[in-house]
């Protein structure tokens, strides 16, 4: 952090008192005003004072230890004037919450010193996905003659299972759902910032020569050691296959197959930077389903965004459907002034979500009725054909909500793998983008907690037909999951 002179002094505080759920966070702030690192840490404390999932997957004692470890690491990074160390300290701390929506969001950083961390020439020059603790090459994007389906055994002398174990503690996810974390640590050309690239570049970069020494075993069993030049952010983005989130171009595809089944592929639902009329496009194609044998919806690479699946559900139901098996909880009635001063959001009403909330005890409140998830109303137009959805561990936000509603409707069969998200509890719905003024790092703070009704497993949603990814599928002329879903729709299974 060459433009800032970090000060590492910080007065001690009682962490148990800080995190006590019944104490207003605003009463515990401003420990030593005017010291920059203190201000950053006070803002983090204020955020944790209202975080809806702080105690969902950890005890107050564990939360206390986690915050203490973060403070120590952040102060150490400050003393070294180490931006990477500060970013890693915050990232590691936020993952201890086991909340898939709490992280130092790569896409929301606007500080030049922070974004510089993400652009370096440290990336592996191929795409891959994790199958358990195995790293499987899926595409040779840089022309190194790597065979898809090859298994990477070592990177720069380190076993890939050990590399995965080193990166998982920095990777967001809900509860114990490591399937989501492995999905985020796969590189498939879907994101402008890949989670693996960020943390591998900071934790396990190539040597000074810029080469990755990779040991691979090809599908035919032949083992080879390759020296591959690392690539930078620009090169990674040049190989992306996902349509940009901006502009008015269609983001999804619709294919009418020879067997009479229509395939709707939806790789993303984040529409806030797009001028595309996605709803009109979707409604027009749903109107064309008269006489179709079935509809297959592929959302396997789609984390979420807007509630773009609602128009589909609306055509499948006869009465309003919430499809959301969670109760909404808040941990504040009044937004701390420090967070108001050091955050932004797209909807200013989020700062007042706690007004009129009903106390539940234990530092939690039930929000007003207008804050709770809205039901989906049935549409006048119907989908009469069978409907299947292809799901997987990437689904954890709006797509997790869609899959819950799809299952609740009783009209959609789910194919694929267990989703991301968590049936016990997730957080989201409304966010603050919190900016730490001294380091310049931003992190996302969800405001609504969603708690499962009754005892729920600490995992995502399981499919009706389980079809885990098989490396043997790479290079196959047809996608086996799509074919299985289409066969079910057409009555051929």
Label each region the model flagged.
Residues 5, 12, 17-19, 25-329, ...:
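Flexible, low-complexity junctional segments that flank or bridge functional domains
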Residues 194-197, 204-208, 354-385:
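Alpha-helix-centered segments that form part of catalytic cores
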Residues 270-271, 355-367, 444-460:
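Extended, charge-rich low-complexity interaction segments
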Residues 291-296, 382-388:
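Short, surface-exposed connector motifs at secondary-structure boundaries
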Residues 386-408, 413-424:
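Extended C-terminal subregions enriched in glycine
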Residues 460-468, 472:
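A hydrophobic, small-residue-rich beta->alpha segment in the mid-to-C-terminal subdomain
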């Amino acid at each position: 952090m060459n433009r800032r002179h970090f000060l590492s002094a910080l007065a001690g505080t009682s962490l148990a008192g800080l995190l006590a759920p019944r104490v207003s966070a605003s009463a515990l702030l401003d420990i030593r005003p005017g010291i920059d690192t203190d201000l950053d840490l006070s803002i983090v404390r204020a955020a944790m004072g209202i975080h809806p999932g702080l105690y969902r997957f950890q005890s107050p004692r564990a939360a206390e230890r986690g915050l203490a470890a973060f403070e120590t690491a952040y102060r150490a990074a400050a003393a070294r004037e180490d931006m990477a160390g500060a970013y890693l300290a915050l990232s590691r701390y936020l993952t201890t919450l086991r909340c898939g929506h709490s992280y130092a969001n790569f896409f929301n950083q606007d500080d030049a010193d922070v974004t510089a961390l993400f652009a370096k020439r440290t990336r592996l020059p191929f795409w891959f996905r994790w199958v358990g603790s195995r790293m499987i090459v899926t595409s040779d994007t840089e022309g190194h003659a790597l065979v898809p389906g090859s298994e990477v055994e070592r990177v720069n002398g380190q076993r890939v299972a050990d590399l995965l174990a080193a990166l998982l503690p920095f990777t967001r996810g809900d509860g114990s759902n490591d399937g989501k974390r492995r999905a985020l640590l796969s590189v498939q050309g879907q994101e402008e910032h890949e989670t693996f690239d960020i943390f591998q570049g900071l934790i396990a970069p190539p040597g000074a020569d810029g080469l990755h020494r990779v040991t691979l075993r090809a599908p035919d069993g032949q083992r080879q050691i390759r020296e591959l030049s690392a690539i930078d952010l620009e090169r990674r983005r040049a190989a992306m296959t996902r349509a940009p989130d901006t502009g008015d171009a269609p983001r999804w595809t619709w294919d009418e197959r020879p067997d009479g089944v229509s395939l709707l592929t939806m790789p993303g639902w984040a529409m806030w930077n797009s001028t595309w009329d996605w709803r009109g496009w979707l409604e027009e194609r749903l109107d064309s389903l008269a006489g179709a044998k079935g509809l297959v919806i592929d959302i396997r690479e789609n984390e979420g965004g807007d509630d773009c699946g609602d128009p589909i559900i609306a055509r499948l139901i006869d009465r309003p459907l919430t499809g959301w098996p969670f109760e909404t909880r808040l941990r504040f009635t009044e937004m701390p002034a420090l967070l108001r001063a050091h955050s932004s959001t797209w909807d200013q009403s989020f700062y007042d979500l706690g007004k009129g909330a009903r106390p539940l005890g234990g530092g939690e409140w039930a929000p007003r009725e207008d804050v709770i998830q809205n039901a989906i109303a049935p549409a006048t137009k119907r989908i009469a054909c069978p409907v299947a959805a292809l799901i997987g561990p990437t689904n954890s936000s709006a797509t997790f909500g869609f899959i819950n509603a799809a299952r609740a409707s009783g009209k959609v069969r789910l194919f694929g793998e267990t989703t991301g998200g968590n049936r016990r509890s997730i957080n989201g719905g409304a966010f603050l983008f919190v900016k730490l003024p001294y380091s310049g790092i931003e992190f996302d703070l969800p405001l609504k907690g969603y708690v499962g009704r009754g005892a729920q497993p600490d995992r995502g949603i399981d499919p009706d037909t389980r079809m885990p990814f098989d490396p043997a599928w790479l290079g196959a002329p047809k996608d086996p999951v799509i074919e299985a879903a289409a066969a079910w729709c057409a009555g051929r299974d």
